Structure formats: C-alpha cells, structure tokens
Amino acid sequence: MRKSLAAILLLALTGCGQSGDHAWLGYAEGDTAFVAAPQAGWVANLRVERGAQVKTGDLLFTLDDTAQAAARDQAEAQIAQAQGQMGQARASLDLAAKELTRQQGLLRSGATSKQALDQAKSAYDTAAALIAQINATEAQARATLTGAAYQLSERVVVSRTQGRVQDIFFRPGEYAPAMTPVVSILPPANVYVRFFVPETEFAKVKLGRKVSIHCDGCAGDLTATVSFIAAQEEFTPPVIFSVGNREKLVFKVEARAPGGLNLNPGQPVDVRPL
C-alpha cells in the first residue's frame, strides 16, 4: 500500500513536467527560535500568548525569584552592617592613634613605661586590623550582591528577536527546567519555502538562482533565491501540495479577545470574515 501511494505521488510530480506545467510543488517553512531561561524555576508570569507579535527587548516571561531576591537582600544587609561597623571602627582607630602618639611622647620624657607604649601600639594595630577586616567583609558582600543581582536578572526573560509567538510550552505555575524552551518565536526573516523539483528538471536549479513564488490568495508573486540543494534525491517528498488536494488542506488559526470570549469549551462556532 505504501509503495503504491509513493508511486502515485511520484507520478504527480513527474506529470507536472510532462504536461508543460513547470511549477514545482512545495510549502512554506520556518526556523523557530526557542526561548529558554538559563535557570530552572517556577513560571511566575507569562506576558505573551500564541500569535502575539513581539520585538527585541519585549518581556516574555518571568520565573519565581523568591530565593534570588532573598540572596540580594541578604547581601545588601551585609553591606549596610559593614558600613555601620566601619564608622565605629574608624572612631576606635582614631582614639588608638592619639593614645599611641601620647604614649610615645611620654616615653621620651620618661613619664611612662615601655609596657604602656607597647599596649598602646597593640591597641592601634588591633583597630587597624579591624578596619581591614571590615573592608574585606564589605568587598565580599558587594561581590555577593553583584552575583545575586545577576541571578535575579536571569529570572526575567526578554525577547532577543522580533517575530510572532508560535507556541507556549510552560505556563504560570509550571516548573521549567533550565535551558528548556518556554516560548517559541518565528522571526519573519526565518520563513522560507521548501519545494520539490523532478529529476528531469534538476539541471535548472542552481545555488543563488532566483525563483518566483505564487500562493493562492496572495496579492502577487514573491521572489526568492535558492539557498540549499539536497545532496541526493528522494522518491517522494514528505508532503505534497498538489493543485488537486490544495483545497482540502486546513490551517489552524486562532482568534483572541481582551479578557477572553464568553464561550464554553467544545462549543461549535462558525467564523466568517468581517
């Protein structure tokens, strides 16, 4: 049965060339861009729907950022704490420096002991070390804040291209693994045609050659350039859009309204153009 069907389809292709009709049958195709988040998480907000037009920079979706926001807040709190400690530490260092200077003067006049001077110097060194420690703590907290802010920004995913939203794979409340597509977008530039040329006319096809494209209902023919030729022939193409069966093909179309439509799932409808 499959061999008979393949033979019939092959005759449909070769018949076009024999009848003088040199049209090559094919269909439009498109390379979809799949948009994923670099991190895993629960989808918190979805800002687009299928069929929506988006441009570069438009918000597509966000992931739950509770943990990332908490990490950012903790880093900010550590910075604030370090800055608060720094004020007190600098005051202590200033007092220790004055005491050290005083003890040095007293020692020269013989009014104090070497032990008192050593204690003053030790207090100064301790205060200076505390300043260095607080500086290091603040620097580490700032580095942590930078990382936390970056992780938080990764929870917000924007479009890197313009085009039409083709599909939604995860919706709010669903868990999206890292690097797994959540939204797919078809950029206009990624749309092309795939057509099939009989072997008897294969010599007419060359890379870089211009072709004219016609479609039912189009305002006029289109022009394209051959960009790929298969390395070997195949018996029949996977799908045949012949003149005889073109009218039997149906294409899925979706229509939406703000706030939704007051219909029940499964309710039959008739749609007419306005």
Roles of regions detected by a PLM:
Residues 232-244:
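Short, solvent-exposed secondary-structure boundary/capping segments
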Residues 195-223, 247-271:
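Surface-exposed connector loops and short turns at secondary-structure junctions
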Residues 12-49, 53:
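N-terminal beta-strand block that forms a small beta-sandwich/beta-barrel module immediately after a flexible targeting
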Residues 59, 65-66, 181, 187, ...:
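Short, surface-exposed secondary-structure boundary micro-motifs
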Residues 27-28, 43-47, 53-59, 151, ...:
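Surface-exposed patches in structured soluble domains
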